[in-house]
């Protein structure tokens, strides 16, 4: 009995020691890293629906040579979606969360991203990329470039129409404030200073368009204004000339009336003088006849 008790005690001690050692080994082997977090929309969806488990499928960043080789092979039954972007372009950085959402929503499509500096210009010319960001869907028979609006719902419709695949889930990227993704912004929500700070290229593009329109229409407006002023001045000069001519005619008419009056006065004076002269002649003739008669009578007496 004593031997059995000793054996049992030793076995119990060994078991406790082994458990403690195992526990210490596990603590030593525990990694000191944080688990990788998925995109913000996946975390938001998991917080809303804890029962749904969606593994994020981020796109693969490749160089230009690798994507050219992959697209040249075009494996049978494989569909590729390629995002061409530029690190300096603010639209590209804002579009990345949407492309990550598409990669998770369509895991049956291989998603790749190509940065501008990692590819030759001939690659962009080959696939018709003239601006960033640009999306290209490629399968074994077709190659389609997306030209529509770059919102999630439009891109999902484009994927479904081009590939025939349906998304495994629908995400809403536009309202994720914590991840810094797209949000619908109305013009009244942001001031001009904030727009210039957040999107300077948009402001520069708008200013360029305004200057272009002004450079086109300002000379036309100035020429029409000059023509209007010239016609207006000519009409004004004609009016002034007509008015002055009328005044001159009136002045001449007044002068003519004065001359006529003076002529009438002169004619009246000459008429009076003539009458006086004729009266004087008659009076003189009568006086001479009377004097002659008196002299003859005195002689007869």
From Swiss-Prot:
Keywords, sorted A to Z: Glycoprotein, Membrane, Signal, Transmembrane, Transmembrane helix
Signal sequence coordinates: 1-21
The keyword Membrane belongs to this UniProt entry's keyword annotation: yes
Domain Thioredoxin: 51-164
Subcellular location: Membrane
Chief location category: membrane
Coiled coil: none
TM annotation in the entry: 201-221
Top-level taxon of the source organism: Eukaryota
Gene Ontology CC annotations of this record: membrane
Classification via Pfam families: Thioredoxin
SUPFAM superfamilies per UniProt: Thioredoxin-like (SSF52833)
Membrane association type: Single-pass membrane protein
Glycosylation sites: 139, 268
Identification of the protein by name: 5'-adenylylsulfate reductase-like 5
Organism for this UniProt entry: Oryza sativa subsp. japonica (Rice)
Gene of this entry: APRL5
């Amino acid at each position: 009995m004593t031997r059995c008790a000793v054996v049992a005690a030793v076995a119990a001690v060994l078991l406790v020691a082994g458990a403690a050692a195992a526990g210490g080994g596990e603590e030593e082997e525990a990694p000191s890293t944080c688990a990788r977090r998925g995109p913000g929309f996946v975390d938001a969806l998991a917080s809303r629906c804890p029962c749904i488990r969606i593994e994020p499928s981020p796109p693969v960043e490749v160089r230009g040579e690798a994507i050219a080789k992959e697209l040249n092979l075009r494996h049978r039954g494989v569909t590729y979606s390629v995002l061409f972007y530029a690190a300096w372009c603010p639209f590209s950085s804002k579009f990345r969360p949407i492309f990550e959402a598409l990669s998770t929503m369509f895991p049956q499509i291989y998603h790749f991203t190509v940065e501008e500096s990692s590819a030759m210009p001939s690659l962009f010319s080959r696939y018709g990329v003239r601006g960033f960001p640009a999306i290209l869907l490629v399968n074994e028979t077709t190659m389609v470039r997306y030209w529509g609006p770059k919102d999630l719902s439009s891109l999902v419709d484009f994927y479904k129409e081009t590939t025939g695949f349906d998304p495994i889930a629908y995400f809403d990227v536009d309202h994720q404030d914590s991840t810094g993704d797209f949000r619908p912004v109305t013009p009244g929500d942001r001031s001009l200073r904030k727009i210039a700070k957040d999107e300077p290229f948009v402001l520069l593009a708008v200013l360029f368009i305004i200057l272009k329109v002004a450079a086109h229409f300002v000379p036309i407006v100035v020429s029409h204004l000059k023509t209007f002023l010239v016609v207006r001045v000519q009409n004004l000069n004609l009016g002034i000339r007509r008015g002055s001519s009328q005044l001159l005619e009136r002045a001449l008419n007044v002068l003519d009336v004065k001359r006529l009056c003076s002529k009438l006065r002169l004619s009246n004076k000459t008429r009076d003088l003539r009458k006086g002269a004729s009266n004087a002649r008659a009076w003189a003739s009568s006086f001479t006849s009377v004097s002659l008669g008196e002299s003859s009578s005195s002689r007869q007496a």
